[in-house]
Amino acid sequence: MKYQQLENLESGWKWKYLVKKHREGELITRYVEASAAKEAVDLLLTLENEPVRVNAWIEEHMNPALLNRMKQTIRARRKRHFNAEHQHTRKKSIDLEFIVWQRLAGLAQRRGKTLSETIVQLIEDAEHKEKYASKMSTLKQDLQALLGKE
């Protein structure tokens, strides 16, 4: 496992995930009967600051169909959490107009690279082009100076 699991922190994330799904109208419990489901959800809502009991609630009451999605969400959140600790791994976001994103995504796909790798490559290409233009300009000036002296 690449990222360390922090039980207390992740229990809080699981609690928030389940509460969010409940508020969005998803069935978060394994119970078909409405009163049993409501009772289990009410219990969950009281467990915000009790990580051990949140995990026990998940084992006992959670809808099994939700388990995989929750694991994926927590795994992604764990990755973002640990990547945010270091400047070089911290993710940044930029706003792009749809057409710009579409063109960039197409270019990245054709090159078989990620969006970030494609952007870096485009920047490097532009820098090389600037260097080349500067060298050509200097060469041209030197050549004109040589020809002008004769």
Curated annotation (Swiss-Prot):
GO cellular component: cytoplasm
Signal peptide location: none
InterPro entries, per the entry: Arc_rbn_hlx_hlx, MatP, MatP_C, MatP_N, MatP_N_sf
Keyword annotations of the record: Cell cycle, Cell division, Cytoplasm, DNA-binding
Location(s), subcellular: Cytoplasm
Gene Ontology biological-process annotations: cell division; regulation of DNA-templated transcription
Main subcellular location: cytoplasm
GO MF term (any one): sequence-specific DNA binding
Function: Required for spatial organization of the terminus region of the chromosome (Ter macrodomain) during the cell cycle. Prevents early segregation of duplicated Ter macrodomains during cell division. Binds specifically to matS, which is a 13 bp signature motif repeated within the Ter macrodomain.
Family to which this protein belongs: Belongs to the MatP family.
Protein name stated in the entry: Macrodomain Ter protein
Naturally occurring in which organism (per UniProt): Citrobacter koseri (strain ATCC BAA-895 / CDC 4225-83 / SGSC4696)
